[in-house]
A protein has these predicted regions:
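Beta-propeller blade termini
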Residues: 364-374, 397, 424-435, 454, ...
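Gly/Ser/Thr/Pro-enriched helix-cap/hinge segments flanking short amphipathic alpha-helices
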Residues: 307-325, 336-337, 345-357, 363, ...
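Membrane-interface helix-loop-helix junctions at boundaries between adjacent transmembrane segments
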Residues: 77-155
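Repeat-based blade/solenoid architectures
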Residues: 338-366, 411-429, 471-484, 544, ...
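Hydrophobic beta-strand segments that make up the repeating blades of beta-propeller
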Residues: 379-384, 440-445, 496-500, 586, ...
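Beta-propeller blade repeat segments, especially FG-GAP/WD-type strand-to-loop junctions
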Residues: 325-328, 390-408, 449-468, 508-518, ...
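N-terminal signal-anchor module of multipass membrane proteins
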Residues: 10-71
Length: 918
């Protein structure tokens, strides 16, 4: 069976009855139509279906229109009442999964409906249309479409509903397939027992059994799909053979760790059955010309329709780029001084968690850039949690010409030497905590208390750090990979937000027990498994991590937590990244929180009083995604004066979802979901067939538009290699994905990930912004290396006016790249607030380059951000590309944070300008 998929019968038992009049009240298709309409309606409103109303509408429109058209042209009957087309369309809306947008939604319904007229014997279709549509989409879409995941159904309680529904429908329709169902269930149980025994050393048997027999997908396949009378056996012996054949082929496919196994098994059976029917009716084809003529006519007509659609798609999706004018040249560690070697962190975790430590500790290799010593060059702090003791949590000072030297931070020695008791440093953010003119360092912690280091450069004249006192709100226990800062109340002091990615305290205990992957509690009674209840309880709506923390800056290095009941936050999502900036141009910093295993969260700042959660009504709208949000980055990609939002996601087998690109069309002060529209697919920034992580915005070729760099790849075997070719863990993950929370929510039910890979060798992307679309030019730009990347930093390390890059990796040393670009005009600005009405870092200040000075002919809009993006803080300075316009002074306007005072400046291009607020 396809792990994680929903093989729902798309065409019901009597779907091919051609009604030329309105159906009767006792038409058996009507209850099926009602049932599927209920599935779809609940799915896009309450459950976790990743289909928008527009996508569902398009699928239905194609099924109905094409069915009526082909019926009229090929069978020359009265106009068809398209009940079957509606049912097929609704079923495909349940079955298929793809990114937001409309073009992909057209593929399955076209092939599903066409198969009813092309592949026939004696005028009857041999393939279940929905099955054919799904198989065609899987084979032809190059991974852009997958069957919908089982977790879209929302939870274990729905399983009983589907079992009861299936039984009632079967009884009501009396389709005489009880032998088929009984034999299939028996054979599949035996097959599953065999697989569970063979795989017992890789995955707990309970996981396989409960994954299959508690999945709505399995019962939908059993009670609906294989019982379709036109495409299933009628005799008892035939039904026994059909059940055995499907289960046997399914077993063979699992031998090769295949996906979509039941789909392919059923398709193989229907193909053989169709050939058998042709053989049985061979006497009718002694003169094959009429049948061949009808087949050719159907094939030609459907080919003409499909070809027209394909041509229209290609015409509107012709993405191309001019010659790439820059190249990323990698700087070796021997020159840069920045490196990282393998550590022993996985082996130091609790022995009961070592089989999943690689999964749970797959995030946290972060980089943060700022000028720590005020010498004008960007310095780098690297967390490197999985690296050796001497490489973890190190500050590298920029000495020019891409040479860096380590600066000692003895305050962090306990974290380097004793992560079991002090935790792993997993995120970092530079900011001027006390508005004294130097950069302090906020450190997010995995399984430990947060740290805040005050920079004493301004006070002593020498770079050095001291710990901000214990008892501060920053000192709370954390499991965090996301920290950021913002002046949420515009008081001139930067506040802190900390995103927790897991539950900090173990549930089920009558006392507070911190969750520490290095040391779990011992069992207190027979069968005590509470310590393993640490995994996500849903694959699309997990709410069992922990609350995110908003800390108000009280001045003097003191921070106080604002309770979520007061700040407007809600839920306990698995937060991976937090982006902050003014999304609706009201002068206050808003928040976008990217969450794994569930919907992201958009919070609009209500004038510094609290945050308003914004959520759309249907899938495809902001706050209603079922994705695996990894990254959140703000920036104005279309220069309309509003920051857009880029969210990295997964686009792989089982999860054809991809990145979100929320284009901002808001009006000033707007606070509803209509502010944003996801245009990742339309703008060719989906990051298809990649496991996305961090991303950053910057004008790489200095043409006046913000480009996107994207980190990819989940887990390789660089630190735990066991076999010459790394086995794929995604297959085992798919078995786990079928299960209910009482299985996949417990770590001891997970398969062993050691020595296995999860999309571990993937190329990063460089998306050039061409105005209305993006083009990936990574290979032309010199990014040919494949691996697993996390944080993506853009910074001008050599101050030459183009953006260099630093990429972090969980199981490899950081990659440092110099941008070697052709000459082009540019101007850079570093803003400094007055520290009273506007914070010294000038976060939230907005800079506009006049349209007459921009090579695009449109004004360039930028905002000063702190730390937008997963595991990476980029250069805070703003760099404007001027293209060929770089000879005379350029005009910039600055709207300062806080009161919003505006100043205009005339600046000389080709250099950075430090602008201090009056």
């Amino acid at each position: 069976m396809l792990p994680g998929y929903n093989p729902l019968l798309l065409t019901p038992p009597f779907a091919m009855i051609a009604f030329d009049r309105l159906p009767a009240k006792n038409d058996p298709r009507l209850p099926v139509l009602l049932l599927q309409a209920t599935f779809v309606t609940c799915g896009i409103t309450f459950w976790g279906f990743n289909r928008s109303p527009a996508q569902v509408g398009l699928i239905l429109l194609i099924c109905v229109t094409l069915d009526c058209l082909l019926h009229y042209l090929l069978r020359r009957k009265n106009l068809l009442v398209p009940i079957s087309g509606l049912i097929t369309g609704l079923g495909l809306s349940v079955l298929t999964n793809f990114s937001h947008g409309l073009w992909l939604a057209a593929i399955p319904p076209f092939f599903a409906t066409a198969s009813k007229y092309v592949f026939t014997v004696n005028g009857r279709h041999i393939y279940n249309p929905g099955l054919f549509g799904v198989i065609a989409a899987l084979v032809l879409s190059d991974g852009m479409i997958t069957p919908a995941p089982a977790y879209q159904w929302g939870g274990a309680g729905i399983t009983a509903f589907f079992i009861a529904t299936a039984a009632l429908m079967l009884f009501a329709l009396n389709i005489r397939r009880s032998v088929l169902i009984s034999c299939f269930l028996l054979f599949y149980a035996l097959q599953l027992s065999l697989r569970a025994w063979l795989l017992r050393h890789h995955i707990p048997p309970q996981t396989l059994f409960m994954g299959a027999f508690s999945s709505p997908a399995f019962y939908l396949f059993t009670f609906f799909m294989i019982t379709d009378p036109p495409t299933s056996a009628e005799s008892r012996k035939g039904q026994v053979f059909m059940a055995f054949f499907i289960v046997f082929v399914d077993l063979l496919l699992h031998k090769f760790q295949s996906f979509s196994t039941l789909f392919y098994s059923a398709f193989a059976y229907m193909t053989l059955r169709g050939l058998w029917l042709l053989w049985q009716n061979r006497s009718q084809y002694r003169n094959p010309l009429p049948a061949l003529k009808q087949f050719a006519k159907a094939l030609l007509l459907t080919g003409l329709i499909g070809g027209t659609g394909w041509g229209a798609y290609r015409l509107t999706h012709a993405f191309s780029a001019d010659e790439v004018t820059f190249h990323f040249s990698e700087i070796p560690a021997s020159q840069s001084g920045i490196g990282g070697t393998k550590g022993d962190i996985w082996e130091r975790t609790d022995p009961r968690m070592q089989h999943v430590a690689k999964w749970l500790l797959s995030v946290g290799d972060a980089a943060a850039v700022a000028d720590a010593d005020n010498d004008g060059l960007p310095d780098v702090f690297l967390t490197q949690p999985l690296k050796s003791e001497q490489d973890r949590a190190q500050l590298f000072l920029n000495k020019g010409n891409f040479r860096f030297e380590r600066f000692p931070l003895p305050q962090l020695d306990d974290h380097r030497k004793h992560p079991e008791t002090h935790g792993l440093i997993a995120s970092a953010t530079w900011f001027d905590m006390d508005n004294d003119g130097d950069q302090d360092l906020l450190l997010g912690m995995g399984f430990g208390k947060g740290r805040l280091l005050r920079n004493n450069l301004k006070e002593t004249g020498t770079l050095g750090f001291t710990e901000v006192g214990n008892g501060n709100a920053v000192d709370d226990y954390q499991i965090s990979v996301a920290t950021n800062v913002l002046d949420y109340d515009n008081d001139g002091r930067l506040d802190i937000i900390i995103g927790n990615v897991m539950q900090r305290y173990l549930p089920g205990y009558d006392r507070t027990v911190p969750y520490n992957i290095f040391k779990l509690p011992q069992p207190e009674y027979q069968g005590d498994r509470r310590m393993f209840n640490v995994m996500h309880h849903s694959w699309h709506d997990a709410n069992n991590a922990d609350e995110n923390l908003l800390l108000r800056n009280l001045g003097g290095g003191r921070f106080a937590q604002i309770p979520n009941s007061e700040n407007g936050f809600s839920g306990k999502r698995w937060t991976m990244a937090v982006a902050t900036g003014d999304l609706n141009d009201d002068g206050f910093a808003d928040l976008y929180i990217a969450n794994d295993f569930g919907p992201d969260e958009l919070y609009i700042n209500e004038q510094g009083k609290r945050f308003l959660p914004v959520k759309g009504s249907f899938a495809g709208s902001v706050g209603r995604d079922t994705y695996k949000g990894m990254n959140a980055t703000f920036g104005d990609l279309d220069d309309n004066g509003r920051p857009d939002i880029h969210v990295s996601n997964v686009h792989e087998k089982l999860q054809a979802e991809g990145s979100l690109l929320w284009m901002n069309y808001s009006k000033s002060g707007q606070t509803d979901a209509a502010m944003f529209k996801d245009e990742a697919a339309r703008r060719n920034a989906l990051n298809e067939r990649r496991f996305g992580w961090g991303a950053a915005f910057g004008d790489l070729d200095r043409d006046g538009r913000l480009d996107i760099v994207q980190a990819n790849g989940m887990a390789d075997d660089a630190y735990d290699k066991k076999e010459a070719v790394c086995p794929d863990y995604w297959y085992w993950n798919a078995q786990i994905a079928l299960t209910n929370p009482d299985v996949h929510g417990y770590a001891d039910r997970w398969a062993d990930v050691r020595g296995r890979c999860v999309f571990g060798f993937e190329a990063n992307r460089v998306y050039l912004n061409k105005g209305s679309y993006f083009v990936d030019v990574a290979e032309q730009a010199g990014w040919n290396k494949k691996g697993t990347s996390r944080g993506m930093v853009l910074a001008d390390f050599d101050n030459d006016g183009d953006l260099d890059s630093l990429v972090t990796h969980m199981t490899a040393a950081p990659s440092l790249y110099r941008n070697d670009s052709r000459p082009a005009g540019w101007v850079g600005v570093e803003l400094v607030g007055n520290g009273q009405t506007c914070n010294r870092d000038a976060l939230g200040s907005k800079v506009v380059l006049a349209a007459g000075d921009s090579p695009t002919g449109a004004a360039q809009h930028r905002e000063v951000y702190a730390n937008n993006g997963l595991a990476a803080q980029s250069d805070r300075r703003i760099l404007f590309g001027l293209g060929g316009k770089g000879s005379g002074e350029v005009s910039l306007s600055v709207r300062w944070c806080g009161r919003g005072d505006t100043e205009t400046f005339k600046l000389k291009p080709g250099q950075y300008h430090r602008i201090e607020q009056k």
